[in-house]
Amino acid sequence: MSASGDGTRVPPKSKGKTLSSFFGSLPGFSSARNLVSHTHSSTSTKDLQTATDPSGTPAPSSKVSTNSQMAGDAAGLLQPSEQTAGDKDMGSFSVTSSEDAFSGVFGIMDAAKGMVQGGLGATQSALVGTKEAVSGGVMGAVGVAKGLVKGGLDTSKNVLTNTKDTVTTGVMGAANMAKGTVQTGLDTTKSVVMGTKDTVATGLAGAVNVAKGTIQGGLDTTKSVVMGTKDTVTTGLTGAVNVAKGVVQGGLDTTKSVVMGTKDTVTTGLTGAMNVAKGTAQMGIDTSKTVLTGTKDTVCAGATGAINVAKGAAQGGLDTTKSVLIGTKDTVTTGLTGAVNVAKGAVQGGLDTTKSVVMGTKDTVTTGLTGAMNVAKGTAQMGLGTSKTVLTGTKDTVCAGLTGAINVAKGAAQGGLDTTKSVLMGTKDTVTTGLTGAVNVAKGTIQGGLDTTKSVVMGTKDTVTTGLTGAVNVAKGTIQGGLDTTKSVVMGTKDTVTTGLTGAVNVAKGAAQGGLDTTKSVVMGTKDTVTTGLTGAMNVAKGTAQMGLGTSKTVLTGTKDTVCAGLTGAINVAKGAAQGGLDTTKSVLMGTKDTVTTGLTGAVNVAKGTIQGGLDTTKSVVMGTKDTVTTGLTGAVNVAKGAVQGGLDTTKSVVMGTKDTVTTGLTGALNVAKGTAQMGIDTSKTVLIGTKDTVCAGATGAINMAKGAAQGGLDTTKSVLMGTKDTVTTGLTGAINVAKGSAQGGLDTTKSVLIGTKDTVTTGLTGALNVAKGTVQTGLDTSQRVLTGTKDNVYAGVTGAVNVAKGTIQGGLDTTKSVVMGTKDTVTTGLTGAVNVAKGAVQGGLDTTKSVVMGTKDTVTTGLTGAMNVAKGTAQMGIDTSKTVLTGTKDTVCAGLTGAINVAKGATQGGLDTTKSVLMGTKDTVTTGLTGAINVAKGAAQGGLDTTKSVLLGTKDTVTTGLTGAANVAKETVQMGLDTSKNILMDTKDSICAGATGAITVVKGAAQGGLDTSNAALTGTMDTAKGTVQTSLDTSKHMLIGMKDTVCAGVTSAMNMAKGIHKNTDTTRDTQSSVLAHSGNVATNAIHTGVHTVPSSLSGSHSIICHEPSIYRATNHGVGQAILTSTESLCCETSSFSDKYGLGHVTEPRADTKTLVSGMASSACAATRSVEECGQLAATGFAALPDELKGLGDIFQPMTTEEQAQLAVSESGPRVLSADRGSYYIRLGDLAPSFRQRAFEHALSHIQHNQFQARAALAQLQEAFQMTDMTMEAACGKLCSDQSLNTMVEAVGSHEMRASVAQDRLCTLAHQLHAAYSSLVTSLQGLPEVQQQAGQARHSLCKLYGLVSSEAGSELQTEQLAQSSAGVVEAWQGLEVLLEKLQQNPPLSWLVGPFTSMPCGQL
């Protein structure tokens, strides 16, 4: 930065010839120099601010204007400016607008006297026409010391007409009390009105706590459906084990065999636990069922209590047997267990589940979740194996398994879950979900099992069972929670939805309460069923904890959609209060074929403060939707001096004719002190012939280690061979926090869709990192390739984390999606948690591979890797997402973001690389991600995210939103990079992608962060040390009638360092892209954040928009001002700089450029610098000085308005519209002979105009380098030979200001030259050789700019700059040679233009 910590610079020694010598041979330099000399006094930086609003935030030049940013280590283009007066004393960063969606956000926070672990699991969505089944599980943990924790989840779903969806919601809360009172109630109500043919059963198994005793409990679930059954669903969960000097083993074996013609079977079981010392525990289950007319249902509910034994033995089992013989169509079973453990406190947990099924629903939903584990000097192993085989004619199979957590003190814990499903002939749907519970033993042995047997003999259609196991761990106050699952089966429903969430709370000297309210209404003709399950765990030591979950679902008529939402919220508070809420609303209206899923994990760590986090997700799908969504999350584990291993293996094979298969598995998290933790998820899916949908989701939790090692990997493989329509896989790996260790996390997602695939969606996010005296690297690589005919895919995920020490944090996320008519989209969201490790090593990897060969329609994969907290260690995280869709694919959307980093005396690096390639016929691709994080020490932080999406008529778009977390760094360096590449080859209409990463750190201050992304503009963030930080993001999307476009926007939030910030962003775009960067204040050191986006557009693209980077740099002088320089270049011809800034005139102002203007908004170089000294603007109208232009060869004139009107009504060939549809291009060979010559001259006039701009900018660069040379010589005591420079030096009064002025000028001129290059590229469509050379010229300029901007904290290096500038000159000379050849021999493939579109629909 121009203002270093000590405010001094060390002048370098001259290393030979000056830079100016490299410009001497440049042709046209002297002429261009003479040109600009006439307009020297008329240009000023205030002209550059025409695109800046009064607040100092650059307003977008057009609807799609972008603040692209060039890559570099320093926060380059932000110069001292004359923005608002309030910004002058403190560096602030203006932010550009982006109107588009954004993808993926994740956050984690770790504070003093606290620890947070949060795991977020899986997201799945199946697309058009699918008859999917979805299962999801989520697990979360919260720890609070001497505080209050509140967590609420509100999920609303509205399905209006023709919905065929199914939603189920279940939640289980656990409480642990010592010397207190515990009450747990379960209320399950089911109403079946007309013609329903369902059966509901509910069972719960209690918990057992033994001191020096033995406990055994088993869960065995067997389902046999013989003839004519349609659906079978099973869900099991195994809990966690806490052993002190003991051994714990828990196993769950679920076997399902469906022989002939069975369609769907669903079973879910849960077992709970209770631990009470010197207290009272009460558990009640109230199950009411009302069956009115013609119902053929059967309801069974059972629950077993809790047992507390001291030096004894306890055995508890749950046996549920159901036999339905003839004509039964549906059977539903639900079981929940509640565990309570309280130390000198009171805990209350209630579950209210209401279900109303009216007419014709046919679906079944199951949800399961798992608990957590705590181990001290022990070993924990967790494994999950899920195998699915569907042979012939099967339509849907869903399986989800999760493994719980284990808490061991000098012991060993092992938990395994084996789920096997075999569907032989004609089966349509099978869903299974298993989770493992938890056990707390002191010097003893515990075994817990659940046995659920269901036999449906003839003609049964549906069977649903739900069971969950809870967990309890208490050392004077521990709670680990369970899962509650609700199921509604109506009539004629075809879809299945499952949602699970777990919320854990750990409170010391507080109060804990947990309640769940689930309401479901299905009115007429709905064919869907929705299930939602959440587990809430509470750990209270002499305190109270409250957690609430509200889930409302409404399915009206004929809808065919499925919605699933899962969230995990972890809160760790020391002497504070934490609140977290989640609101999920979904509406499906008319004809829409979309599916929306949203999952978020929010982790909060507060020491002596308050935390509040809210999530609001709204989705509206109108009519005829046919989609399915699933979301799962995993929890966390805490281990001291032990080793933990957790693995999840999910294998799915669908052979012939299968339509849907969904699997969801999540593994818990581990916290180890001086131990080793390993976690892996392996998900393989193979769909051979005719399969339509396959969904798999797995996620691994988080690991917390002290002086240990943690490894986590996720491997997801999907192969779809022939005729498959949909495949969805989601995997997430947890987070890791290491002190004095190393953490590595990688995510690799590969997708290959060959022929006829319609949709592929992948989203990966990496969490956040907290490092003290270490190094953190985070990388995200997302590649998308859509070749032919792809239409739309959407994926959205957001995670938020907050780290506060003695402060307050509030975070909210609001995601709204509205799809009105005919939409065919799918949305999925998943996030992962975080981990805390001290003096250990953590490695986490996620590998997701998908191959779809022929005829596949939809494939969705989502993987996320968690966060890492390292003290004096190293953390590396990478996400690699590759997508390849070859022919016939309709839509592919991928969004990934890397999280945040918290480092004390360390270095953090984060990169995001998003590559999108759309080749032929692709219609829409949308990705949206935002990263916002807040880390506050002794302050307050608030963060909100509002994402609104509206798709009205006939839209075929997809929206994805994801956000990743933030970083906290003290006295070190943080680097974050975002690289977005987009390639659109042929016939693509619109593709927009944007990503941003950001972080906020406040020391002894208050931070408020809100994300506000609108189609027009965004507002920036302010960072203050001992101050306030605000960030807002608003994302709105409106798609009207028949629109086939996709919009993507990204915003990077701000970072405030305790002693330094350095931010740089570099973006190169040939595709419509938007990036928004927020940046903050610096104390002494630097944070580097870079965003690099490189899209490329090829021939035949309908609308490609090229944005050049906005660059910003903050200076810490008294008058230093962080400003924003924005350059935007669009594929359609833009009005000249002279028009934009009044520096001249062009012969013909072009109306088609009114809204797509290539512009630059820049503030003054410094408050003390005069306007004249700021330099000239490179863009000068080529007709402004005709006398000077005579020596430059033939000057071509553009077509007049009359000529263009004649061309518009002619019978010319196909026309390629610009992005704003205000102008168009035509292939030169397709023009009539009468128009060909003038069109050729018209195109050349634009090329010449851009050439003159580039030459002028190069000439000024030469002069600027000369001034730089003299400035450095003056610093070494030499005389300044230029009087004007002496004057400037006297005015500024310091060498630092001189160097800053020279550097600012170099950056500005590089920007102007880059803009000229970009405009040239837009005029060279259809000329790949020339475009390649132009790209090389821009690349060489970007390297030069990187050198200039990266030297912000030291002197410019003459030798390096000389070499780079020589490369710039050489590349430009090569480009001019090709342009000369183009003038002599124009190829017929050249897309000439732009020509103004005529009104009245003539085009």
UniProtKB/Swiss-Prot annotation:
Region (Disordered): 1-21, 33-70
Compartments it resides in: Cell membrane; Cytoplasm; Lipid droplet
Pfam families linked: Perilipin
Region spans: 29 X 33 AA approximate tandem repeat: 104-1060
GO cellular component terms, semicolon-separated: cytoplasm; lipid droplet; plasma membrane
Domain of life: Eukaryota
Function: May play a role in triacylglycerol packaging into adipocytes. May function as a coat protein involved in the biogenesis of lipid droplets.
Family affiliation: Belongs to the perilipin family.
Official protein name in the record: Perilipin-4
Gene (name only): Plin4
